[in-house]
């Protein structure tokens, strides 16, 4: 009887901890204050016989070659990370002040 109670409590604690970990991971994944973007630069990169990678000279600045370990080819990608939490939340008065003003005069 004592062993069954102890086993039941262990299982209950394990389930509780699992739910807490799941909840914290999904909450962190849904953070709307962070944005990570990846864009394809329109070209691929290759590794030559000397072991150096071809440069990524695409339309966009900041293109880098990303490749899997052991592969001789990769993709030229541009990555950008934006943390919106560094910007304050605009108040309604700031939004009103930033709106374009409507001209009430009529042009002929």
Swiss-Prot record:
The keyword Transferase does not apply. Residues 96-108 have a biased composition (Basic and acidic residues). Keywords: Disulfide bond, Glycoprotein, Secreted, Signal. One of its GO terms (molecular function) is chemokine binding. Residues 89-108 are annotated as: Disordered. Disulfide bonds join 41-63, 45-65, 56-76. This is Evasin P1156. It comes from Ixodes ricinus (Common tick).
């Amino acid at each position: 009887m004592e062993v069954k109670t102890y086993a039941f409590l262990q299982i209950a604690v394990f389930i509780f901890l699992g739910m807490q970990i799941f909840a914290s991971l999904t909450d962190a994944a849904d953070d709307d204050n962070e944005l990570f973007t990846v864009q394809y630069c329109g070209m691929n990169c290759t590794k030559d016989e000397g072991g150096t990678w071809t440069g990524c000279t695409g339309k966009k600045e900041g293109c880098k070659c990303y490749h899997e370990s052991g592969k001789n080819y990769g993709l030229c990608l541009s990555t950008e990370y934006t943390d919106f939490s560094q910007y304050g939340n605009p108040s309604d008065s700031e939004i009103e002040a930033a709106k374009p003003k409507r001209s009430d005069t009529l042009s002929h």
